[in-house]
Amino acid sequence: MAQRTRLGDLLRPLNSEYGKVVPGWGTTPVMGIFMVLFLVFLLVILQLYNQSLILEGINVNWNGAG
């Protein structure tokens, strides 16, 4: 038998929608938008690392903090 805890009682309302499926696409388009934004973020980081994206006046040194 599961033990009841105060934390479990506080979190129970968050789990009240468990098993229910929203008809249609739901929040899938929002997830897609965030995935694309994250991909763009990763591409910018990669380009900064490869120095293929050069920002004027900003020196990027990957040799360490010293």
Swiss-Prot record:
GO terms for cellular component: photosystem II; plasma membrane-derived thylakoid membrane. Signal peptide: none annotated. One of its GO terms (molecular function) is phosphate ion binding. InterPro entries: PSII_PsbH, PSII_PsbH_sf. GO terms for biological process: photosynthesis; protein stabilization. The keyword Isomerase does not apply. It is a single-pass membrane protein. Keywords: Membrane, Photosynthesis, Photosystem II, Thylakoid, Transmembrane, Transmembrane helix. The chain crosses the membrane at residues 29-49. It is found in: Cellular thylakoid membrane. Belongs to the PsbH family. One of the components of the core complex of photosystem II (PSII), required for its stability and/or assembly. PSII is a light-driven water:plastoquinone oxidoreductase that uses light energy to abstract electrons from H(2)O, generating O(2) and a proton gradient subsequently used for ATP formation. It consists of a core antenna complex that captures photons, and an electron transfer chain that converts photonic excitation into a charge separation. HAMAP family: PSII_PsbH. PSII is composed of 1 copy each of membrane proteins PsbA, PsbB, PsbC, PsbD, PsbE, PsbF, PsbH, PsbI, PsbJ, PsbK, PsbL, PsbM, PsbT, PsbX, PsbY, PsbZ, Psb30/Ycf12, peripheral proteins PsbO, CyanoQ (PsbQ), PsbU, PsbV and a large number of cofactors. It forms dimeric complexes. This is Photosystem II reaction center protein H. It comes from Synechococcus sp. (strain WH7803).
